[in-house]
Regions:
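Short, internal acidic amphipathic alpha-helical interface segments
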Residues: 20, 80-122, 154, 165-176
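Soluble non-cytosolic domains of exported or imported proteins
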Residues: 24-32, 90, 94, 130-137, ...
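Sec/Tat signal peptide C-region and signal peptidase I cleavage site
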Residues: 8-13
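N-terminal secretory signal peptides
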Residues: 14-78, 161-164, 175-202
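Sec-exported extracytoplasmic/periplasmic mature domains
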Residues: 39-43, 145-159
């Protein structure tokens, strides 16, 4: 096998990272640890006011796309945050529920749902024992690549989906359960403290984003009309 991999004409793919020391460890998702990584990636960001849990959130812009990172599962109350909710909001007059279901069934890395004024695309990351710097970059790269896919799939849906009560309906519960399993968090069985915390964060994600979107100004939403071809 080794010989065949080294044979002439066969090249092993090399992942190129923008970040230095990609195998180095980010201890957790506290802003003090995550901020320098965002700086190194050239992502513009600022800490926002503390949320209801007393944790400051990050508002960031990359390639013209506004997104938010909310440290979660904070072992120290407002620090030692070993989870991170990353999401972007998009304005849309209507969005098809069929399109939402189809997208969520096709892409496990992110999930989407309706929000006031449009829809959201979100991702949850875990760093119980730290996370490689390169993995943070890869996660953000994948998240942003799928934002383009989501916009193409969800923009201009024919029927409007009401956001009222969506976070509590059966479809959302099934998606949260699937997301938990995809992250290695078994649902409805005894779990470690960290696993239980992550599951709680995943379950409350739609309601958290819905409330955030309802209170946010228009400047928090990305305008899909500006995307070429839309």
């Amino acid at each position: 096998l080794a010989a065949s991999l080294c044979a002439p004409g066969i090249a092993l793919a090399q992942v190129q990272y923008e970040i230095a020391n990609p195998s180095g460890t980010v201890r957790n998702f506290d802003i003090a640890n995550l901020g320098p990584v965002l700086d190194e990636l050239g992502i513009q960001w600022q800490a926002t006011d503390q949320n209801q849990d007393g944790v400051s959130e990050i508002r960031a812009v990359r390639d013209g796309i506004i997104f938010f990172i909310v440290p979660a599962a904070c072992i120290g109350g407002t620090s030692g945050c070993v989870g991170a909710q990353t999401f972007a909001l998009f304005s849309a007059a209507s969005v098809s529920q069929q399109a939402i279901n189809a997208f969520n069934a096709s892409y496990a890395f992110v999930s989407t749902g309706p929000a006031p004024k449009g829809y959201y695309v979100s991702r949850y990351d875990i760093a119980d024992f730290g996370i490689a710097r390169g993995n943070v970059e890869s996660s953000l790269d994948s998240f942003h690549a799928l934002l383009d896919v989501a916009q193409a799939a969800l923009a201009g849906g024919a029927s409007t989906v009401s956001t009222l009560g969506y976070a509590d309906d059966l479809a959302s519960a099934r998606l949260n359960e699937a997301s938990g399993r995809a992250l290695g968090v078994e649902v409805r069985v005894p779990a470690s403290h960290a696993g239980a915390e992550h599951l709680r964060e995943i379950e409350k994600m739609p309601e958290l984003i819905r409330a955030f979107a309802g209170a946010a100004g228009d400047d928090a939403f990305n305008k899909i009309a500006n995307i070429p071809g839309q």
